[in-house]
Amino acid sequence: MPVSQSRARARDRNNVLNRAEFLSLNQPPKGTQEPRSSGRKASGPSTQPPPSSDGARERRQSQQLPEEDCMQLNPSFKGIAFNSLLAIDICMSKRLGVCAGRAASWASARSMVKLIGITSHGIPWIGGTILCLVRSSTLAGQEVLMNLLLALLLDIMTVAGVQKLIKRRGPYETSPGLLDYLTMDIYAFPAGHASRAAMVSKFFLSHLVLAVPLRVLLVLWAFCVGLSRVMIGRHHITDVISGFIIGYFQFRLVELVWMSSNTCQMLISAW
């Protein structure tokens, strides 16, 4: 036993690492355990921050976007062209609206310009046509007037239906008048005064024998009616152009369903 103890002491003495100045080499550094454990903790799944609810909601909404919204991010050539024409239409209509308000450059001429538009209103034309129909004594005159009355009623119903469907506002905030409410001419597209002026002008040029100066004046009247509606800020330029086109097709439709003299006499007698 003493021999074994002496051998163990000699072995420890011979081992250089057991000396006091080398004991620190056998022990791991004090700061190494914590970084490893902290790194191990950081790499673990339990320490990952939970995803924010806002980010998850945005990703969910982006996955549920309809195709129309995705297509708006990459508009087609037709969409770009349409938006460009629409912007030009609004800009030009606002520039031509020189009588749109009291502070406009031509505000003093607003009453006169508005009077030009009233010459193509539906109520005066329907009332005047009925009055002429009552006083007419010829079959040919009654036939023309009855078909003109049909065309005017068709124009009012067509314009009111399209305006109710489109519901486009004018370039300026202008409230419709009492006569506009009676004819349901509330919105901007299409321009009812312009369609009526075009239809009546074409009707008179086709069924009345007029001199050349009167024909020119009739065409100028229709053009001035459309321009007056833009000047007072009631319609856009495209509204007036569309009104002219609709008025022409209304005339063509009345020509197709033209009522004969016998039909007109039957309706007059029933009335």
Curated annotation (Swiss-Prot):
It holds the Pfam family PAP2. Residues 1-69 are annotated as: Disordered. Residues 1-112, 163-202, 261-271 are cytoplasmic. It comes from the Eukaryota. Gene3D superfamilies: Phosphatidic acid phosphatase type 2/haloperoxidase. InterPro entries: P_Acid_Pase_2/haloperoxi_sf, P_Acid_Pase_2/haloperoxidase. Residues 134-141, 224-239 are extracellular. Keywords: Endoplasmic reticulum, Membrane, Nucleus, Phosphoprotein, Transmembrane, Transmembrane helix. The modification Phosphoserine is found at S43, S62. It is found in: Nucleus envelope; Endoplasmic reticulum membrane; Membrane. Plays a role as negative regulator of myoblast differentiation, in part through effects on MTOR signaling. Has no detectable enzymatic activity. Belongs to the PA-phosphatase related phosphoesterase family. This is Inactive phospholipid phosphatase 7. It comes from Rattus norvegicus (Rat).
